[in-house]
Amino acid sequence: MSLFKKIVTLVLAMSLMTGCSLTNNADSQKVFNFADSGYVTSLDASKAIDETSTNVIQAFGDGLYAYNVKSKLKPAIAKSMKVSDDGKTYTFEIRKNVKWSNGDPVTAEDFVYAWKRALSMRSDASKLLTSYGAAIAGADEIYNGRKSADTLGVYVKDKKLVVNLAYKTSRFMDLVTQPVFFPLNQKFVEAQGDQYATSPKTLLSCGTYKVSSISKDKITLKKNKKCYIAKKTNIDCINMYFGISNEDKIKMFDEGKIDFAAVTGENAKKYDGKDSSTADPDSVIWDLVPNFKDQYLSDARVREAMSLLLERKKYNKQVLHDGSHKAQGLLPMGICFNSNKQFIRDASSYKLKYDKKEAKKTLSKLLNEYKLKKFTFTLTYTNDYPATKAIADKIKDDLEATKQIKVYLKEVNTVDYNQAELSLLRIKGVCNDAYDYLAPLAVNNQGINHYANNEFNNYFRTEVNAKA
């Protein structure tokens, strides 16, 4: 529909759909070595939200349900689940044979405590319990400080976990696989105080592995023999290395020091077609976000001209070399959106295009109108991912191609999207729906970059949020 055409011209999206992974044959080994470009920010499941931290937590933690190797949801700590006719109440029966690494049983109360604790902390991760995510009854009020955590719509009945939602949403079952929904042993956590999750001694595991050692650059996990599926686990030890550059990942892989790494860039090309590499689907969007309070970026004609200058198809060929696809809108390909389960990209006839000649003509007219020699903008980004700087460099080159725009690059630890003129936003959806990709534009969710459109907000609330 026309609304999407309007939004797409405002946010200059380019989609990076896949990542190249290198895998050595570790089947016959008892130790698995993994390299990550990021660093762990926290091993506290109530706080962690970044990919690196959640990857580690998912190795030593477990949830009600989990995805298997075929990406199908299967019972984990929950033995079974029932849903009410109105889709708003979930009842989970907890397995009796699940134990913490100290021998304590994992109970339904552990989930209640964990969820209330996260919301009481008002962490970024706890937002997944609110209407931004799972829509648990009362979560919004608790997160916003209007009510106490005791009012959360979750309780224990006959040793079963009962969860009441504010409204029916299919996202709930996807989200319970995330660490913030994992159980916590209240007695143990409170005994550790502020030191909880800072060392192996201040952590408990209910998952396949338990943390053996922790440093900034490396975490070692060993098999949790008390785990209910310990006998099905072939790997005894996992070494996770952090802060590893693309070049060092490839070097370590070639030397046999690691068994798995995700890589991008020029050096990844030599693995094309080899059995040791695979292009893994990963629904990530990189958005070039304009600030709608800016004098010039608030002009749709300026934004549309900038969009015409982005050579999206060359970002894989010249920058990433990982099988990424160019964007055709705000959503990655293969993301379900409408009630008929039709992919939004298939449902839309709108296509982003590259037209340097048309962009130059438009910019000439605009520069004359604004009495400027050049448009000048600063593009702000964080270097959390190996590809970010290279993508920012390519955007700069694209936008400066007609010599009518000057772009300065600014690397920061955290982007203030409301202050930055242009910013680079990476979005990886938690679920296979449109919600996470469109929520940043919705005023009632994040409303970044001062974007405000009543038509979009109404559509997001009634169509996207309601059907997610």
Residue ranges and their predicted role:
Residues 35-85, 204:
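N-terminal lobe/hinge region of extracytoplasmic solute-binding protein
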Residues 324-366, 384-388:
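Structural transition elements
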Residues 216, 360-429:
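Ligand/substrate-recognition segments at binding pockets and active sites
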Residues 217, 225-270:
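Ligand-site clamp/hinge motif
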Residues 293, 297-338, 355-356, 391:
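Periplasmic-binding protein-like
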Residues 126-187:
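Surface-exposed binding/hinge segments that line
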Residues 165-233, 237, 247:
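Gly/Pro-rich hinge or "lid" segments in bacterial periplasmic/extracellular proteins
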Residues 154, 351, 408-415, 437-468:
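Extracytoplasmic/peripheral linker and loop segments enriched in polar/acidic and small residues
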